[in-house]
Design a protein with these regions (language model features):
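N-terminal lobe/hinge region of extracytoplasmic solute-binding protein
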Residues: 1-30, 131-132
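Extracytoplasmic/secreted proteins, especially bacterial periplasmic and envelope-associated proteins
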Residues: 6, 15, 19, 23, ...
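Solvent-exposed coil/turn segments that connect beta secondary-structure elements
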Residues: 16-17, 33-34, 42-44, 58, ...
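Aromatic- and charge-enriched surface segment that lines or borders ligand/interaction sites
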Residues: 26-71, 179
Length: 182
């Protein structure tokens, strides 16, 4: 999941004081019962493949999570009520989430790193090229348990600190120590 920080981003994020703030979202409103959330997306956000981030893309990702069901170690499905209804309005640039019960902390739930938005148009190639809006994108998948080579996302809206990042997985504590010392 640490990889998600560089490849994907969420509608919300935790700031340095651990307060939730909009990230891919520009703003949001919530009804008094905390059962209907209308989230307005920021304009001009692009996925690493150049496609625009739209409310429909976000809705498709949430639907994909429901379809996949709880699996893997991250289980992003647990951060959005399974029965929630998600409606996308691309013209208004809004996403409406209706829950069956009050959900006072929905922005906090959507700020969790596993809720980074992914373009699910091509789910066959997730390992080799997850499409996100983050500062980096996958250049090379080096194999399970080996890692990834990341490159700067040319469609990112800000400068990134590095042109390339190598993520290496090391299960052995001694190997980690030796790698850090070299």
């Amino acid at each position: 999941n640490a990889m998600r920080y560089g490849i994907t981003e969420g509608l919300f994020k935790f700031n340095d004081s651990m307060e939730v703030e909009p990230w891919l979202a520009e703003s949001y409103t919530v009804n008094d019962e905390h059962t209907e959330w209308v989230i307005t997306l920021k304009d001009g956000i692009k996925f690493s493949d150049g496609c625009d981030l739209t409310p429909t893309k976000v809705k498709e990702y949430f639907e994909y999570l429901k379809e996949m069901g709880p699996s893997g170690s991250a289980k992003p499905q647990k951060y959005l009520e399974f029965e929630a209804t998600v409606t996308a309005d691309d013209e208004a640039n809004t996403l409406t989430i209706q829950t069956t019960q009050p959900y006072a902390n929905l922005p906090g739930q959507l700020a969790h790193p596993t809720m980074g938005i992914v373009d699910v148009a091509d789910t066959e190639n997730f390992d080799n090229g997850t499409i996100g809006t983050g500062p980096y994108m996958i250049d090379t998948f080096n194999g399970v348990g080996v890692g990834y080579d990341l490159v700067a996302n040319p469609n990112y809206r800000e400068e990134v600190p590095y042109d390339e990042v190598k993520l290496m997985y090391m299960g052995d504590a001694s190997a980690k120590t030796m790698a850090l010392q070299s």
